[in-house]
């Protein structure tokens, strides 16, 4: 039976890759709803090609522009806007599958709505689990939702684990691989001078600006450790990170008997997306077959926590529990936004996050309101910390120590 998709974040890199796979298999997939924040022109192009019933944007002005262009083109897609509209298309009876690809905390509410509606969820928005892990996983279990990871690392782990949960007891640990980003071998003393353009040039993957910066600081890998904790019900001590510059092995599972299973493939997000879309079937993703002879060699190294303090901060937040991970994520979003707008330097990102974690009290996350309050408090604290920095010193590491 054809799957009906709501694609949250359709104009981003994950959205592009998802629609590429969907277009290859029109007999399997159709689009119920697409969403974008403010990239109305690209959303119009997608609507004209895939003819969704609903398109969601971030604000009324963008909605009016998109609706006018669609009417002019004779497209009948309904255009709505705002956070509630995202929730509506995520829990609608018009779809059975929700691809959650909105970057950041903005993706939490619609992803949670999809879980509570019992949808099949393809999760690319790691923040939903980072912020509200127990709450989100409870919603999935209590409402019969199906959760399939789209992040390449978590999708790799999913493929390497036994299908039956009862057999997961044989798992010794999971190993998330990381490319090390664009600054893996750069002299640490020069990192204070990194520009947004340099940070956004990932050596292997095509990604959006925010996640590219997170990869450069390795905060992205830290968030993935937290996500893996909730997805696979393993403590942080049994989740390792391994630098693998070629990005060919996407992650590994180590078993009690000494076996290690790994998932390999070319670094292209269409592979995990196609796997999750068609699961348990396999379909063509458009990705070239892996040629190991051409690659010739694969290398590995341990992460340098001095070079990548954000990775250590994420591990610390996971160990502390409560709302610490939500605060970590919120502070990082504010810090990365400030870096991209050239308000602070690259090395200041970790310092801002560290300052927020050390300032805000941690507490239990019993309900979504607890998470949202921690998120808001961390954003305020991060913004206030950045604002207190002298203008001439914001781009130095020393200014935020």
From Swiss-Prot:
Database matches in Pfam families: DXP_redisom_C, DXP_reductoisom, DXPR_C
InterPro entries according to UniProt: DXP_reductoisomerase (IPR003821), DXP_reductoisomerase_C (IPR013644), DXP_reductoisomerase_N (IPR013512), DXPR_C (IPR026877), DXPR_C_sf (IPR036169), NAD(P)-bd_dom_sf (IPR036291)
GO MF, one example: NADPH binding
Cysteine disulfide links: none
Annotated binding of Mn(2+), by residue: 151, 153, 224
Enzyme Commission number(s): 1.1.1.267
Residue sites binding NADPH per the record: 11-14, 38-39, 125, 127, 208
Reactions catalysed: 2-C-methyl-D-erythritol 4-phosphate + NADP(+) = 1-deoxy-D-xylulose 5-phosphate + NADPH + H(+)
Any one biological process term the GO annotation gives: isopentenyl diphosphate biosynthetic process, methylerythritol 4-phosphate pathway involved in terpenoid biosynthetic process
Annotated 1-deoxy-D-xylulose 5-phosphate binding sites: 126, 152-153, 179, 202, 215, 220-221, 224
Keyword tags: Isoprene biosynthesis, Manganese, Metal-binding, NADP, Oxidoreductase
Pathway info: Isoprenoid biosynthesis; isopentenyl diphosphate biosynthesis via DXP pathway; isopentenyl diphosphate from 1-deoxy-D-xylulose 5-phosphate: step 1/6
Necessary cofactors: Mg(2+); Mn(2+)
UniProt keyword Manganese, yes or no: yes
Function: Catalyzes the NADPH-dependent rearrangement and reduction of 1-deoxy-D-xylulose-5-phosphate (DXP) to 2-C-methyl-D-erythritol 4-phosphate (MEP).
PANTHER family named in the record: 1-DEOXY-D-XYLULOSE 5-PHOSPHATE REDUCTOISOMERASE (PTHR30525), 1-DEOXY-D-XYLULOSE 5-PHOSPHATE REDUCTOISOMERASE, CHLOROPLASTIC (PTHR30525:SF0)
Protein family according to the UniProt entry: Belongs to the DXR family.
Name this protein carries in UniProt: 1-deoxy-D-xylulose 5-phosphate reductoisomerase
The species this protein was found in: Paraburkholderia xenovorans (strain LB400)
């Amino acid at each position: 039976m054809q799957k009906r998709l709501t694609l949250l974040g359709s104009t981003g890199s994950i959205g592009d890759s998802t629609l590429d796979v969907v277009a290859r298999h029109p007999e399997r997939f159709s689009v119920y709803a697409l969403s974008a924040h403010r990239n109305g022109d690209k959303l119009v192009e997608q609507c004209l090609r895939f003819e969704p019933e609903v398109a969601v944007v971030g604000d009324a002005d963008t909605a009016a522009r998109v609706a006018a262009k669609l009417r002019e083109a004779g497209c009948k897609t309904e255009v709505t806007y705002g956070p509630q509209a995202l929730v509506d298309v995520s829990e609608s009876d018009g779809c059975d599958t929700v691809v959650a690809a909105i970057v950041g905390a903005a993706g939490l509410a619609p992803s949670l709505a999809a879980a509570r509606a019992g949808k099949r969820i393809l999760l690319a928005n790691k923040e939903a689990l980072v912020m509200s892990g127990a709450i989100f996983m409870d919603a999935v279990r209590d409402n019969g939702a199906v959760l399939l990871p789209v992040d390449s690392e978590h999708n790799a782990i999913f493929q390497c684990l036994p299908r039956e949960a009862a057999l997961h007891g044989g798992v010794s640990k999971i190993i998330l691989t990381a490319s090390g980003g664009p600054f893996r071998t750069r002299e640490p003393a020069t990192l204070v001078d990194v520009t947004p353009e340099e940070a956004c040039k990932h050596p292997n993957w095509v990604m959006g600006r925010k996640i590219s910066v997170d990869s450069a600081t390795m905060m992205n890998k830290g968030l993935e450790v937290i996500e893996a904790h909730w997805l696979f019900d393993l403590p942080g001590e049994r989740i390792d990170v391994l630098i693998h510059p070629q990005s060919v092995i996407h992650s590994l599972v180590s078993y009690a008997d000494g076996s290690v299973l790994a998932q390999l493939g070319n670094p292209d997000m269409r592979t995990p997306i196609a796997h999750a879309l068609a699961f348990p079937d396999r379909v063509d993703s458009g990705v070239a077959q892996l040629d190991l002879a051409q690659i010739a060699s694969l290398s590995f190294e341990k992460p340098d926590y001095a070079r990548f303090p954000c990775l250590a901060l994420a591990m610390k937040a996971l160990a502390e529990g409560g709302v610490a991970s939500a605060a970590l994520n919120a502070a990082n979003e504010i810090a990365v936004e400030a870096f991209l707008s050239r308000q602070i330097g690259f090395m200041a990102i970790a310092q801002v996050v560290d300052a927020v974690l050390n300032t805000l009290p941690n507490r239990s996350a019993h309900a979504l309101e607890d998470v949202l309050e921690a998120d808001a408090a961390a954003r305020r604290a991060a913004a206030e910390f950045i604002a207190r920095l002298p203008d001439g010193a914001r781009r130095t590491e020393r200014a935020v120590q």
